């Protein structure tokens, strides 16, 4: 990022407390969609007027309360998505309640979770995304303790349990699966959770050029299985 008013990215972004990403995204989404709705409303009203089919008794009330929930598929795809980004500490732990609330709201906000399975930004402490037996800061191995003593929180399964969201669990080792999931999730009218295995070379103790290999081993060993879940595809 950068310091206001400078922006190094080709799109708008905001910085905030790292656990607040989903909550901030909800507010941005409402303002963003309100602005888009004004434009779509003007276009629809003009089309009705030109066709001579505008009926005040029907359309006045409709356009008074017109919002993103009435967008057509074409209109929805014209709206730049609102994307919240966070690591496992932000989304699995301290900000999980914010993420859960956002998913239950049904707002089509997209959340990218970079799952390193440790607190990479504060020194590699253990977190709930790590596996049982993991050795890391705050989860030592010795005569009394044998690494992390808690089982892993499965974010993707929790996302599915909300029954409102598109869920992708992916890895850079399988790029086709990853890109297809991103496209499906971004185009979905639902919230989306992209839970992505992210190698932290320093804390995982692997070489700088070994991220793809490490990701491949995580997938093939079934430690990090790949899947996509779309509630709109029906009962499976």
Regions found by a protein language model. Name each.
Residues 113, 169-170, 193-197:
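Short, conserved beta-strand edge motifs with alternating hydrophobic and charged residues
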Residues 1-111, 118-120, 124-134, 145-150, ...:
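Cofactor-binding active-site loop characterized by glycine-rich and histidine/acidic residues
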Residues 116-121, 201-203:
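Short gly/pro/ser/thr-enriched loop/turn and capping motifs at secondary-structure boundaries
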Residues 149-155, 175-179:
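Active-site glycine-rich loop that binds ribose-phosphate moieties when present
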Residues 84-86, 166-171:
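Short catalytic-loop micro-motif centered on adjacent basic/acidic residues
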Residues 6, 180, 184-236:
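Glycine/aspartate-rich loop-and-adjacent alpha/beta segment that forms the canonical ThDP
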Residues 89-93, 171-179:
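Active-site glycine- and acidic-residue-rich loops that bind
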Residues 101, 158, 184-185:
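Hydrophobic/aromatic ligand-binding patch that stacks against planar heteroaromatic rings
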